[in-house]
Amino acid sequence: MESKNTSLTNTYDIVSRFATEGTVADIRPLGNGLINDTYKVSTKEADAPDYVLQRVNTTVFTNVDMLMDNIAAVTRHIRKKLEAANVTDIDRKVLRFIAADGGKLYHREADGTVWRMMVFIPNAKTYEAVTPEYSYFAGNAFGHFEDMLVDIPEKLGEVIPDFHNMEFRMKQLREVIEKNPAGRVGEDAVKQLLDLIGKDAEEMCKAERMGREGKLPKRVCHCDTKVNNMMFDEEGHVLCVI
């Protein structure tokens, strides 16, 4: 796994690699994400936006070009949809990534670390607690996200192959059960879980079968549909999916 030690002094130099507005006043860690390191970049000027600087975990996301091409295509398409619908305050309802030196939406350091930057959305927050109310908001927001992407013209790449392929995951599970590396397969609690999964396995793999049979069209999906992957305004209304 990649080291998550990043010097705050070094982040000032990294920010300079992006086409930002204003002068950097402060850089501080932001959020508690487990995959990427995230920082808020505050600017001095009142008319300049603040930014979010993020180190991409290239152990998880090995194909950064594909990752950022996907993100660019998705955010561009959503922005066009919002503009066509005359939606107001669009910059708070879709992410805007900043180009780095060379025009790409990421910067790669000499040590191989990869960074990306987006405009910070003011007066917005995320929620960690999962309540029935916010679960409803999540379902509605992600459903709207999928609906806006149903006609995206670009073909998106599969950044982590088979990540949500249940047939592949069941194959992995069977292999681990056979090897039993931790010696726990015989435990009552583990056996109960494995029995439960076994009973539902055919239904869990149904989407893959229907896809092969041409009964289920391929669609763009978010693949990390959690409540804390959306931004809310101060009144608790959903702003955008992140």
Provide a role label for each language-model segment.
Residues 240-242:
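Pre-DFG segment of protein kinase catalytic domains
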Residues 225:
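Hydrophobic HxD+1 residue recognition
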Residues 228-231:
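Catalytic-loop signature of eukaryotic-like protein kinases
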Residues 46-70, 76-156:
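ATP-binding pocket architecture of kinase catalytic cores
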Residues 20-45:
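ATP-binding glycine-rich phosphate-binding loop
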Residues 1-28, 74, 78:
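Juxta-kinase regulatory segment immediately upstream of eukaryotic protein kinase catalytic domains
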Residues 38-40, 117, 220:
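Conserved hydrophobic/aromatic beta-strand scaffold that supports enzyme active sites
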Residues 2-5, 28-32, 54-65, 121-141, ...:
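ATP-dependent phospho-/nucleotidyl transfer catalytic cores
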